[in-house]
Swiss-Prot record:
The gene is cyb5r2. This is NADH-cytochrome b5 reductase 2. Its main location: membrane. Belongs to the flavoprotein pyridine nucleotide cytochrome reductase family. One of its GO terms (molecular function) is cytochrome-b5 reductase activity, acting on NAD(P)H. Keywords: FAD, Flavoprotein, Lipid biosynthesis, Lipid metabolism, Membrane, NAD, Oxidoreductase, Steroid biosynthesis, Steroid metabolism, Sterol biosynthesis, Sterol metabolism, Transmembrane, Transmembrane helix.
């Protein structure tokens, strides 16, 4: 090869290779690839550490319930809460430390914020609690920009997707991973929040064939929390979410059940007891202990397949 023509041939080769690369590379590859989930920063790094987060929005949902939105350390942060887990809020109220557990209604895919839906128990509205709820009233009195301490993740149940649940009998035990085809859910009042968290995770995954059946108990129709969200999921995923309501004091024309959760209601609206059916419950202790557990056992559900938040 002529020494003078060698640089020309090399230059032409570089141009050809560059043109071929630009022509053959996939469309849209100029954009920055999305961050893998494990690279997205998480706000909750250590379950023993308290993380102060600021209140950035407050929205009234109904007569006694509000949605509180807290900001995460940056717009790219997620909370870092596995499905099935909850967080603890802690605050000094009248000189005493008050700690309460909550399950966010926002997804852990949401970046930059976390949402809590809280029923506010005001003073002198419930004869058994004349002082009202300490934490709920504290939240209600927070101003935009005020911070409160978050701690987590916490809880004995984690949903790993596609019917796989890691469940611990207590905090000191190792989790046992079990697979279920159907999740029977019973919720009362604000106990709907962990159910919605689980329902959203299951219905968001088109490859997850797990079916959820939910009985949701409330006092009146106006007390039904997150009804629009539940009804929307049911409309969009009728084969994956079976939804039923019951009210203590229904209005005229109410088309669902009336009264406390009972065995007949469970038989009609939950899957029959089986080894591949998991029952999860969350609500007032009296409802769980007096209405739910005895009737579930009577219908043949095994204790090892029943989980109460």
């Amino acid at each position: 090869m002529d020494i003078l023509t060698a640089p020309v041939l090399i230059g032409v080769s570089i141009v050809v290779i560059t043109v071929l690369y630009l022509f053959l590379k996939p469309a849209g590859s100029n954009s920055t690839p999305p961050k893998p989930q494990n690279k997205i920063p998480k706000a909750l790094q250590d379950p023993s550490v308290k993380y102060p987060l600021p209140l950035i929005e407050k929205e009234e949902i109904n007569h006694d319930t509000k949605r509180f939105r807290f900001g995460l350390p940056s717009s790219s942060h997620v909370l870092g809460l596995p499905i099935g887990q909850h967080i603890y809020l802690s605050a000094k109220v009248n000189g005493s430390l008050v700690v309460r557990a909550y399950t966010p209604v926002s997804s852990d895919q949401d970046q930059g914020y976390v949402d809590l839906v809280v029923k506010v128990y005001y003073k002198n509205t419930h004869p058994s609690y004349p002082d009202g709820g300490k934490m709920s009233q504290y939240l209600d009195n927070m101003k935009i920009g005020d911070t409160i301490d978050f701690r987590g993740p916490n809880g004995l149940l984690v949903y790993n997707g596609k019917g796989k649940f890691a469940i611990r009998p207590d905090k000191k035990s190792e989790a046992e991973v079990r697979k279920f085809k159907h999740v029977a859910m019973i919720a009362g009042g604000t106990g709907i929040t962990p159910m919605l968290q689980l329902i959203r995770s299951i219905t968001a995954d088109s490859f997850d064939e797990t079916v959820c059946s939910l009985i949701f108990a409330n006092q009146t129709e106006k007390d039904i929390l997150l009804r629009n969200e539940l009804d929307e999921v049911h409309r969009n995923h009728p084969s994956k979410l079976k939804l039923w309501y019951t009210l203590d004091r229904p209005s005229e024309g109410w088309k669902y059940s009336e009264g406390f959760v009972n065995a007949a209601m469970m038989k009609d609206h939950l899957p029959p007891a089986d080894s591949d059916v998991l029952v999860v419950m969350c609500g007032p202790p009296a409802m769980i202990e007096k209405a739910c557990l005895p009737n579930l056992l009577k219908l043949g559900y095994k204790k090892e397949n029943i989980f109460a938040y």
